[in-house]
Structure formats: structure tokens, C-alpha cells
């Protein structure tokens, strides 16, 4: 196995790295070969240093193992027992399955971790996390059966769960006016999911009408019914916000562009912004938003049950914080300097990840890219852009531009700060994957080599 690495140390031969013309270190790409056993040792070494895997026993060299008097014992090795900690990866997977409402996978993983032992536990587990109900609601939305989904939500949770009002105080105290304004803008986009479902239902009604073979026969009646639906269900909500009114107007524009076969050369091509409204991925996006809102609704009850010892299950929605707040000090020395001489700010190990990412202007701007669950719809000039962003969840194409523009030059790109208390219900595994991508983008931006396996 040959690994391409960035060497920042001088070697005797100077073939991989050496002194630069000015006597400084020459940062060049070198190659180092590992056998499978050596590579496994390297992986195990850094995994242990970062404490990413928790074992029941830890082997300490006796020469560094402290004794009761504070000194150290003779050389050799000894094993001490430690408190068993739940394996990281299975816990992450269980958090993902429960959050995404995958019933079978959740039950299997919970059985492997020992949380479920019999059929009674399965029933209690499902009732606590509402996995079946949330999956059914998501499924209905993805099929375009929006009325059925809203009836299901109303019967189980109540529609008011989708109409959460923005609170500028409470959890928002201590934030600057700018932060509260950004949070208000984000709420305007993602807050009223009841309106989004009603609007999506309007789109599905128009889609269904256009797919009929003979649409001219009942066209007038359909338009009258559609206008009545908009007045009764959407008008009041839309009148409270310019953005909502723009979204409603854009959806109503679909009536002017009937669906037509691509083979028909005389047909009018549907504009891109309207194509996005018909996109199936828009259903999935809204289904995921609804699922997160339902998780936020049931989580306090779950915490109450656990705090009062009424539940044998742990809080699987709020994963072990050690997963996100690991001590990464051992890795930082390798990221001190980029090959272009750029100094990378040292990351303190006693901060949570979201604070680490905001330690300087460059990382603060990129932080909003990987942590922000929404697509930076703030400041969009039209409803078309809003719906386009709803459909396309593109986190990474703008990273380089953000990193460049934030280095002392403001280009007017605004992204909301991420507050862990606001949107904690995205699966932790997804957050870690975003963190991984963010780190790779940072390494690439600072011209730091990443090990790669070559054939």
C-alpha cells in the first residue's frame, strides 16, 4: 500500500522533502509505503490517542502507569478495568435509524446493543419514539398524498406542532441583534411547515389535474375549486409574509404551464423554477423537515420519561456528546502549516465542535455550510430561488468561495449561524459526514496533502 502524504520534514536524501531556496522547509508531496499490518497499527494508534473507540480494558505501560502514591511503577504492562462505554459506531447508526424512522433497522440495532430483549420492549420502543407513525407520515408525503399525511399528523400529534411560532426571547437571549435577525429569517423559511404542506398539496392538485387525459372538460370547475382552496387554506398565512405570498403566486403560475410530452414540439417548455416545484425531491425535503419537527415535539416527553426512570431506553435522539466533543489535540500538530505557508488556527480540545469551527473568520463562514441544515435561503430575491434551494441541498460547492471571501473581504454572502439547540434532530452520523467534508475542504483549501491509496 502506497500512501501519498505531504512531508514537512527534511530528509537526508532530500528526494521527498528538503531545504527550500531560502533555507526554509520545502513542503512537497512524498510517498511512504505501509504493509497492511503497519497501516492497521497506524490506524489503531491514532484511534486510541483520540479515544474514538471505548474498550472495557486499557493496557498501560507500567513505566508510565501512575500508582496510588503518585509515582510510577516498573517497566512492563498491566491491564486495568474501566467503565464499559457504548460502542460509538453502533450508537451512531441507531441514532440515524431512529431519527430517520427506519423501524426494522432501529429494532435490529437496538437488539444488538441490548436495549430490546423481547416483543414487549419492541412495542414500548416504538411507542416512545413514534417510529411507525413518523415513517407512515413521511411515506405519505413522498407519495404526494398530503391531505392524508396532515390528517395523520393531526390525529397523532395535532397540527399545531407544525405551526410553531418564533420566540425572540427564551433560548435566544444572549444573542446579538444580527444573530436574532438571522434566526428570524431562517424561521420564516423553515418554521411554518403547515403552510408548506398546504402549498405542496396545492402543487399536487395541479399536477394531478394536468395529468388527466381530458383536462379541458372540467378545467373551469377545477380552477374555481383551486382558488377557493387557496382563499380558505393559504390566503391568511400568505398575507402574513412576503415570502409566503411569493411562494403561493409561483405555485399558482403552474396553471399557465400544463404538463406536456417532450415529443410535442409545439408545447411550451416549463421554466426551471416551476420544474423544481414538480420535482419529487421537493416532497422528500419537506418530509424530512416534518420528521425533524415531530422529533422536536416528542423529545421533551422522551427526556421526561427517562429522567423519571419510567423508560428503560436511553435518549437516542441526543447522542453521546463524546462523539462530537472528542479530544482532537493529537491531530492538531499535523495541521499547523499548509504547504503555502498559511497558518491554521490551533483548535482547542476543550471546546465543542461547533465552537471550534467558529474560532476564526474563515472557519466561521465555512461552519454555516456544513452545520446549517438549510440551504442559506436567507436574502433570496424570489420564491423561485426559495423552492430551488428547497429541492437542491448543495452544501459544498460554495465552500471555496466562502473561505476566500471571509479572509478579510466581505462579499455579502450571508449564512445563518448554527445553534445546536435549534436543530439538533438531524442524525449525528449525517452531521459527522458533513464535518468530514468540511475538514477535507479545509485541507484542500490550505494545500495540505491528504493520504490516498494508490494502485
From Swiss-Prot:
Annotated compartments: Nucleus; Cytoplasm
GO (cellular component) term, any one: cytoplasm
Residues annotated as domain CTLH: 130-213
Keywords (A to Z) from UniProt: Cell cycle, Cytoplasm, Nucleus, Ubl conjugation pathway
Main location: nucleus
Pfam families in the record: CTLH (PF10607)
Region (Disordered): 1-21
Keyword Transmembrane: no
GO biological process: negative regulation of gluconeogenesis; proteasome-mediated ubiquitin-dependent protein catabolic process; traversing start control point of mitotic cell cycle
Transmembrane spans: none
The LisH domain, residue ranges: 85-117
Disulphide bond pairs: none
Compositionally biased spans, kind Polar residues: 1-19
Record's keyword annotation contains Ligase: no
Listed PANTHER family: RAN BINDING PROTEIN 9-RELATED
Family in the record: Belongs to the GID8 family.
Summary of subunit composition and partner proteins: Identified in the GID/CTLH complex. In the absence of stress, the complex exists as an inactive anticipatory complex (GID(Ant)), composed of VID30/GID1, the E3 ubiquitin-ligase RMD5/GID2, VID28/GID5, GID8, and the RING-like subunit FYV10/GID9, awaiting a substrate receptor to form the active E3 ligase complex. When cells are shifted to glucose-containing medium, the substrate receptor VID24/GID4 is induced and becomes part of the complex, named GID(SR4).
Function: Component of the GID E3 ligase complex recruiting N termini and catalyzing ubiquitination of proteins targeted for degradation. GID E3 is regulated through assembly with interchangeable N-degron-binding substrate receptors induced by distinct environmental perturbations. Required for the adaptation to the presence of glucose in the growth medium; mediates in association with the substrate receptor VID24/GID4 the degradation of enzymes involved in gluconeogenesis when cells are shifted to glucose-containing medium.
Extra information: Present with 639 molecules/cell in log phase SD medium.
Protein name, as recorded: GID complex subunit 8
The species this protein was found in: Saccharomyces cerevisiae (strain ATCC 204508 / S288c)
Gene from which this protein is expressed: GID8
